[in-house]
Amino acid sequence: MEACVSSLLVLALGALSVGSSFGTQIIGGREVIPHSRPYMASLQRNGSHLCGGVLVHPKWVLTAAHCLAQRMAQLRLVLGLHTLDSPGLTFHIKAAIQHPRYKPVPALENDLALLQLDGKVKPSRTIRPLALPSKRQVVAAGTRCSMAGWGLTHQGGRLSRVLRELDLQVLDTRMCNNSRFWNGSLSPSMVCLAADSKDQAPCKGDSGGPLVCGKGRVLARVLSFSSRVCTDIFKPPVATAVAPYVSWIRKVTGRSA
């Protein structure tokens, strides 16, 4: 358990600086078709990509709560991007609401936050909210999912200029919680994931980005944390299930409707 806590601590603190242990990364994967994921958001600090996010409402982006360990005045949300150096549509953050039961490092439980834009998005080909799941959504072990991010393409590298995507499979949570893997660190709302190849993995600040699972274009998970070594097969990346939090999301976003 001590080793797991140490890994989580390194990763979450790494989110404080781009390019450190919890920057943004997809190792492997492929470039997405431009604007085929119009719900993607880039949370940026002083113009540099920090974490992913997903537009779930014309005024709100969902991300990982630990991504907000920053001075809010330095943060912006950028929508409609394919390449990081393109202009996109930039918003100030009017309000940031972490889940009321969020537990920071080492637990990282309920690792979700809602960010209110200082304007309202008009849905278009390049910017469009992603549908929330039903409160009863179940994503079973073996389910195929995909995620996207602007991350490093190899350990210790630079951010990708273009949005890349990676196919993943949901793993059995009991297995992920055994002593060879996360050793009891995972809460019931967490799920771990694996790519088709051991040389591929999301990691380092792709946190906050959405996982879309199954055939429907519906949000299923938000990436939370991983290991210092992104492709460590015994510390697979972990995401937070969205379905248990749908009531909270609707309550918060409904205030601005």
Swiss-Prot record:
Main location: secreted
Listed EC numbers: 3.4.21.-
SUPFAM superfamilies linked to this entry: Trypsin-like serine proteases
InterPro entries xrefs: Peptidase_S1_PA, Peptidase_S1_PA_chymotrypsin, Peptidase_S1A, Trypsin_dom, TRYPSIN_HIS, TRYPSIN_SER
Matching PROSITE patterns: TRYPSIN_DOM, TRYPSIN_HIS, TRYPSIN_SER
Cross-referenced Pfam families: Trypsin
Signal peptide boundaries: 1-23
Tissue: Highly and constitutively expressed in activated natural killer (NK) cells.
Gene Ontology terms: cellular component: extracellular space; membrane
Localization: Secreted; Cytoplasmic granule
Superkingdom of origin organism: Eukaryota
CDD domains: Tryp_SPc
Positions bearing carbohydrate: N177
S-S bridge residues: C51-C67, C145-C213, C176-C192, C203-C230
Propeptide: 24-25
Name under which the protein is recorded: Granzyme M
